Amino acid sequence: MTQTMKHLFPILLLLAPLFAGAQGADSAAFIRPPYLQPGDTVGIVSPAGKLPLKTDTAKIRERIESWGLHVKFGAHCADREQPYFAGTDAERAADLQRMLDDPSVKAVIAFRGGYGSVRLLPLVDLARLREHPKWVVGFSDITMLHLALRKLRIESIHGPMPAGFHFDGKEDPSAESLRQALFGETVCIEVEPHPLNQPGTASGRLAGGNLTVIRSADGTPEELTAEEPTVLLIEEVGEFVYRIDRMMQSLARSGKLENLRAVVVGHFSEMLGMEKFGVADACAVISAYTRPLGIPVVFGFPAGHTDPNLAVYLGRRVTVGVDDTGARVEFARED
């Protein structure tokens, strides 16, 4: 070591924490895709299950165009040749990658969930979105894509998908919430009081989605972790209640609940085996794990397999407030 370096070494040691802090701050930032503007184009793909026969793509196009947007459908989004999936893995991955790479497409919306998104992860390059970010939208099985985007620190939208839009002449608050999220209008969602709510106020980045998909990602590159202040969103459909308990046990035993700042519990719809398990609903099972945490918990949040299913920004800093009058989830305007 030269004499100059010997003199500089103590100074560098003193400055090291400052550089580390600056690096940590930069790495903590999430990339926020640009909000949509009238005249923009959205791409619709089917990364998982094939569409129901009753799906009316013409009405879906008309609905989205009424928002002032243009629509591109993936080449295989309506394929029905496979027993379950909307095309082969290669076809679905190619559709998704084309929409991700198309500079004219400002948001990529999953047509529906089901199962199959995880099969595309080895075949697509989501990292390109760090250079040219755009919104990825969906819920349920699409949670796997959200988890992958979280690892890349890119915000995404957990929300309704076109296959679930209503065309019965009545208002469709789910679809309207998606429009609001795409155009950057979602600021705060208020929820009615729930007997299992836990009071308090806390902030963190919103993460999560479908509970089964979250647990299935354990041990993979997409595994959900909470090293930073995190607000966990969970929802589920069609599961036996004992499996909900098993998954909550796994979250607790793996330490994934320890660093949470708040929990937002969406709808647990069409639950099975409740009488046999001795509970009135899945919320009672979840509450047994969240209550000892001593953090704000919101039950009955309108997200998941429910109507309305409101769109929320994953990766966004949120503030959760819960009291006797209800609950509020506020989305930060700046990162």
Regions found by a protein language model. Name each.
Residues 14-21:
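Hydrophobic h-region of N-terminal signal peptides that target proteins for export
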Residues 23-104:
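ATP/NTP phosphate-donor binding region
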Residues 41, 51, 55-59, 63, ...:
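Conserved beta-alpha junction segments in alpha/beta enzyme cores
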Residues 224-282:
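Internal helical hairpin/lid segments
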